[in-house]
Swiss-Prot record:
This is Pre-mRNA-splicing factor CWC22. Residues 548-648 are annotated as: Disordered. It holds the Pfam family MA3. One of its GO terms (biological process) is mRNA splicing, via spliceosome. Keywords: Cytoplasm, mRNA processing, mRNA splicing, Nucleus, Spliceosome. It comes from Candida albicans (strain SC5314 / ATCC MYA-2876). PROSITE patterns: MI.
Amino acid sequence: MENSTTTTTTTTVTQPDESYQRTKWIETKKNIKQLLQQLTPSNIKQTVLQLFQINLLRYQGLFIREIMKQQIRITTNAELYGSLISIINSKIPEIGELLINRLVLQFKKNYLQNNKNLINSSIIFICQLINQQVLNEILILQILQMLLESNVPNNNNNNNNNNIELAIMVLKQTGSYLFKHSNTALIMILNRLKDILQDGANANANGGNGGVGLSSWNRKSIEYILKLARNDFKNISIIKNGLDLVETEDKETHVITLEDKLYSRDHLNVFSVDEEYLDHENEYIELKKEILGETDHEDENENEIQVIETTKNYEEKITDMSQSELLQYQKTVYLTIMSSMSSDEAVHKLLKLNFKSKIKNKTKNKTKTKTNSNDNEILADMVIKCCSQEKTYSKYYGIIGEKLISRNDHWHNLFIKLFKYYYDIIENFETNSLRNLGKFFGHLFASDKLALDQAWSNIKLTEQDTNPAKRILLKFIFQEMIEELGINEVKERLINDDYLKPYIKGIFPVINVDGKDADAIRFSINFFTAIGLGVLTEEMRYVLDNLSEPEEEDDRGRSRSRSYSRSASSSSYNSRSRSYSRSQSRSSRSPNPRGRQRFKTKKHNHNESRTPSRENLKRKRSESVTDRNGNNNNNNNNNLQDLLNNLK
């Protein structure tokens, strides 16, 4: 036999040397600066495409530093830069998060140093990021609370007037957004401004000895803001036309507060040699292909970013998946859920899988297709189906649903829609699946991610409107809520919240009832007693005892019934100012009014805290005038602090 020798050749990839990397760094720095200087509303889409050609992960420090410098130089471009960041953040959230961290740190530093220009620049940029839903509104509410505190560190008229001036600027920038998303907190802020206006008038009348005097400019500005609020900020748009370029389901919102420990990562601003330069470049090339939907044979002009096309300029074409594609997609979602080690990993993989599906459909159809909502609904539905097929319920699925809902309103509305769908067809499921579904949705309700006023508004707990399967589902939902929250918290949320009562009267019929509703009340009482939750029926029993039979109703009975109705209505009205909506913080989205508070509004936010307030928000004008020690102001600040804690 002949001996054969085999020689193996190993190919070593030579990494670019320091000189090459440094030259590339300098060129990229100049390129980023030039692109940002030439940015206009008309070329923002082309600029985004050019920026994505740059490795934004490698050069994120340069990019963020340059955009902050440009915004300081030209503060009027804040809306334009906010729109640009919103697009990039929807694809690379790390960049949006780093920018927010640096802006908050810049604000804190310059607020202590009283550097007015940098304070204004930071605040304006932060406000625009909130309007674009890159940043949650909790941060700006905390800043407003800090600015309007009665006990400022330096009780100086100039400092106080500067703080008020800054607060007015914030409300001009974000008032319309806060009116829509955090109405309860906004009302507190407006009430505080009214107190400041009254105290300032008294101080000026007393020659400055009665308190902090208001400058004429601030007095007029406060009156202007209050006038805007009375008109529901109707004439102020949240985002200018042409700059709302990211679809709701694609927005990434960061939750950052003043108390968070933040890092500016300044080392990203300076050059350093990358020992794995080519590997990192190849990783970004793959990411860029996902973002832009590139193929080897597509012309650059065909590379569009899905999120930067508005839905208002053309008619959308709806394209559904074929049956085979749908089955394959569902199978992939199932395998992804089953193979993940944690809920965080599962959500990350599912969203990445969903994004690839959108890019594939877009490339295939060559046109803008309305597949985003369809893909998201299929994904959410598969999470629910996977949960229902388990032998025993696992909170793993509940946390996946919780994290998806927390992303934005789009996902919240999808799960509300799916809950109503499964409630209507629940009789098709076996008992084991019923238990899993009940515990899954019970977890979402207990965690405050699904708004009860939207999910339960159509449920009627009567013998005619329910069947055994629906009642079993409701039983498991309530049992899961009791297990996670405790009976006292569930009672506080469901029974003692006057705002919620009109929306869940089909389950707890205690308002606007008469003798005709006696059977429905008895059925509900019997249901909750049978499942061991009789403590939730106390108010219903009281209502039932005070109802008079329709056929035996005389004048005295009618008078008593009307009196009870008026009493219940009055109680509900008076308690509204003490009870916030229990909708989730970025997350529950109930647009229904909370009733009259001290400041009249017509529309209310669906993003309010669902925890009841501890004290009445109404404060008499006379108390504000006579209380020179600022007790009312402190109470208002405490109320706002409680609300901010609940939002977090």
